[in-house]
Amino acid sequence: SILEENGDAIIENSDSVVAEIDMDEEIVEKVVYLCQKHNKKLFGVVSNMNIAIERKDLLKQFDCLICNQLESSILFSRDFKEISAEELSHTLIDELQQSEFNSLIVTLGEAGSLYVKNNGESGFCQARQIEVKDTTGAGDAFFAGVAIGMTYGKELKEEYA
């Protein structure tokens, strides 16, 4: 496979790596290994929470995971639907520390987004009120912006300032 033949060169020459967590498990494991070997930041996005739950040990190896509020509820087996952003931040910090995940960004739809780190740091960014025409690709664009900022030295608290 390309990853077996050229994975070292690909990862070594990358500034960071973005991975879909629910890809083939062997591929995700190889990507995690190569990122650790070459000291590269690894960002994960989740599409299938059932697979993510099965791979919690792998998720601990990611520098940052991004999901929405419903996905975070599934990931931690809790109902976060009727909870304020502030309360969610405190709860997620506890969950992050127990799970040994590094950091998590949770999108909250029209309310905005929040981040939590396992060191207790957290932040909230209120969404700008705009007229939405189409949300296609919004989550991917958000994820890309976060990953690029963190790749080039921005801290989550700076990105949320």
Annotate each predicted stretch with a short phrase.
Residues 1, 34-36, 42, 63, ...:
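Domain-wide signal for the mature, well-folded portions of proteins, strongly enriched
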Residues 9, 33, 94:
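Surface-exposed charge patches
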Residues 9-10, 57-58, 97:
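Structural alpha-helical scaffold elements that stabilize or flank donor/cofactor-binding regions
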Residues 15-90, 111-113:
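Conserved beta-alpha-beta core of the PfkB/ribokinase-like small-molecule kinase fold
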Residues 1-16, 21:
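Conserved phosphate-binding/catalytic loop of the ribokinase/pfkB sugar-kinase fold
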Residues 12-13, 39, 61, 100-102, ...:
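Short glycine/proline-enriched coil/turn segments at helix->beta-strand junctions
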Residues 51, 78-161:
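Conserved phosphate-binding/catalytic region of the ribokinase-like
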